[in-house]
């Protein structure tokens, strides 16, 4: 085996080529299809205000000396909130018309803060002692009527609305909840009407919903993979939305190259009205080196990953989201030579075996407006010495800490021109096994280089890209965009004996052509120009900086 390793070293087979299961590039979530719409989906006709009754001891031509005003039934405003209104009526004689103005001012305060179905009135009372009581009637939702659902559970929709309709009813919060419901991929359209209920302050909400088709399928071809395992990949994915009728999501994907078969299944199920999600993820990869001359060594690998986790939104509005999550995952990787002989191509794995048990704490934040989208993601990973995790005294193993941060800014420059900036970084306090390292190079990080051209324990990668429409639906042939870009990335390792091959910093620039024939069919061709030369480029379309991506959505 020592002779084999020597031959591999002389031949210049890098760790990236030798590992058929390389690290996953630090991709950010996909760009939004569109900026959020601002159309109102809630119809609120004029609702009757609470009845105004005359105080029993006061007629329209009388006035009383007011020494105290008590607002009863109020749960929204503090004494400090009401003081500017009440102070102008205290310590003087007040007429009947002024009492009506007082209740109107309190009602207006409710309305200004979104409590449109709330108000105040002056009930019959004895005012001879100078104490005036104003009764607040705070609006409540009496009933929710839902029409149009067949597959989706009424309870799921009611829970989504009920979170924002707790008394007192705030129409701004209710409309935000309806907009979130409209963004649910399982629902196509939402129409809502608020009508008067059976008593003052009570309202009824009538929802008319149209369900979306529950399945989304995608087929695509691209040349994103390392040439060592076959760069051209064909993939198929299927996503199910609310198949169980409770807001659940099920997605699966299968991708195949000449040397790789990779598939995963991802499941998320909300378990309460606060939209807490339980998540499960499973991925399996089988790889084989097919690049000449190393294909003669029958180098292959397998990898399995399984994660269980929970995700909790803390802020959830149509324009802003913040969620935290935690997951426990197991990763098992095996590499072989001569088809079935365990073999390690880098420090850390034991006879080709890498086991990682990791606790991952995630924070995700998104902010949207009509003109821009900001997204950030932070992940703290703690490698645990559990479930047979790889353990070494003086080499990378399964006990480690790493932080991965990702940021994305999309800005509309007008005329459908977009500015897109991305930044991702991984910082590790420990030497990492290959399956946890950070990679740069390829169509999703630094264009102009091979996929995973450089790999390290820590790294930073960023890009700036413009998307400029040059043709809009010429003869019914869709939209064509030009996408000039600049990408920069660098990686480094811990330990002086584990230096990243020079150069460890990659810089690429170039231009792409995006063609969107329709919502179902699109294609992208990108030409990346490396500004920092590397010696290990190989011979492929990727080596020439050319990447393509063709996507078709049949449903």
Task: For every predicted segment, state its role.
Residues 391-555:
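C-terminal transmembrane beta-barrel domains of outer membrane proteins
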Residues 215-217, 244-250, 273-278, 287-288, ...:
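Repeated loop/turn-to-beta-strand initiation elements of outer-membrane beta-barrel proteins
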Residues 217-219, 238, 250-254, 278-282, ...:
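Membrane-embedded beta-strand positions of outer-membrane beta-barrel proteins
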Residues 277-432:
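Transmembrane beta-strand segments of outer-membrane beta-barrel domains in Gram-negative
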Residues 223-224, 251-252, 292-297, 339-351, ...:
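Extracellular loop and loop/strand-boundary signature of outer-membrane beta-barrel proteins
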Residues 192, 215-225, 236-242, 246-258, ...:
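Transmembrane beta-strand segments that form the barrel wall of outer-membrane beta-barrel proteins
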Residues 201, 230-234, 259-263, 302-306, ...:
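Residues that define the transmembrane beta-barrel architecture of outer-membrane proteins
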Residues 19-225, 236-237, 253-264, 403, ...:
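Periplasmic polypeptide-binding modules associated with outer-membrane biogenesis and secretion
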């Amino acid at each position: 085996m020592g002779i084999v390793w020597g031959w591999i070293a002389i031949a210049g087979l890098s760790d990236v080529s030798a590992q058929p299961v390389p690290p996953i590039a630090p991709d950010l979530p996909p760009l939004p299809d569109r900026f959020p719409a601002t159309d109102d989906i809630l119809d609120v006709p004029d609702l009757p205000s609470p009845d105004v009754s005359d105080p029993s001891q006061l007629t329209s031509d009388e006035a009383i000396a007011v020494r105290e005003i008590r607002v009863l039934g109020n749960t929204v405003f503090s004494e400090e909130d009401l003081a500017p209104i009440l102070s102008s009526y205290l310590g003087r004689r007040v007429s009947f018309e002024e009492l009506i103005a007082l209740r109107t001012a309190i009602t207006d305060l409710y309305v200004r803060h979104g409590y449109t179905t709330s108000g105040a009135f002056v009930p019959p009372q004895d005012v001879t002692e100078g104490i005036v009581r104003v009764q607040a009637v705070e609006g409540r939702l009496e009933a929710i009527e839902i029409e149009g659902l067949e597959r989706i559970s009424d309870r799921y929709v009611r829970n989504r609305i009920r979170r924002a309709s707790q008394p007192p009813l705030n129409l701004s919060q209710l409309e935000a909840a309806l907009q979130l419901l409209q963004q649910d991929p399982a629902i196509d359209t939402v129409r809502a009407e608020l009508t008067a209920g059976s008593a003052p302050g009570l309202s009824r909400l009538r929802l008319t919903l149209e369900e979306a088709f529950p399945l989304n399928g995608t087929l695509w071809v691209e040349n994103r993979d390392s040439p060592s395992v076959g760069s051209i990949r064909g993939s198929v994915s299927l996503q199910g939305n609310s198949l169980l009728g409770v807001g659940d999501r099920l997605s699966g994907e299968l991708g195949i190259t000449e040397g790789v078969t990779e598939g995963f299944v991802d499941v998320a199920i909300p378990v309460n009205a606060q939209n807490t999600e339980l998540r499960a993820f499973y991925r399996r990869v089988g790889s084989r080196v097919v690049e000449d001359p190393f294909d003669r060594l029958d180098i292959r690998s397998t990898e399995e990953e399984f994660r269980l986790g929970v995700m909790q939104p803390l802020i959830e509005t149509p324009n802003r989201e913040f969620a935290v999550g935690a997951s426990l995952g197991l990763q098992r990787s095996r590499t072989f030579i001569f088809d079935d002989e365990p073999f390690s191509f880098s420090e850390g794995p034991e006879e080709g075996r890498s086991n990682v048990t990791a606790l991952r704490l995630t924070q995700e934040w998104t902010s949207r407006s009509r003109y821009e989208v900001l997204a950030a993601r932070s992940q703290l990973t703690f490698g645990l010495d559990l479930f047979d995790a790889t353990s070494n005294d003086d080499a990378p193993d399964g006990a480690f800490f790493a932080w991965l941060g990702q940021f994305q800014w999309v800005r509309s420059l007008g005329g459908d021109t977009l500015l897109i900036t991305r930044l991702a970084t991984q910082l590790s306090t420990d030497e990492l096994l290959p399956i946890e390292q950070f990679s740069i190079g390829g169509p999703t990080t630094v264009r102009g280089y091979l996929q995973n051209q450089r790999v390290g324990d820590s790294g930073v990668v960023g890009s700036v890209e413009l998307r400029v429409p040059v043709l809009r639906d010429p003869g019914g042939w869709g939209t064509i965009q030009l996408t000039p870009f600049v990408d920069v990335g660098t990686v480094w390792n811990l330990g002086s004996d584990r230096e990243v091959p020079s150069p460890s910093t990659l810089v690429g620039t170039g231009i792409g052509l995006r063609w969107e024939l329709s919502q179902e069919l699109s294609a992208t061709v990108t030409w990346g120009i490396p500004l920092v030369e590397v010696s290990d480029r190989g011979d492929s379309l990727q080596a020439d900086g050319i990447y393509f991506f063709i996507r078709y959505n049949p449903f």
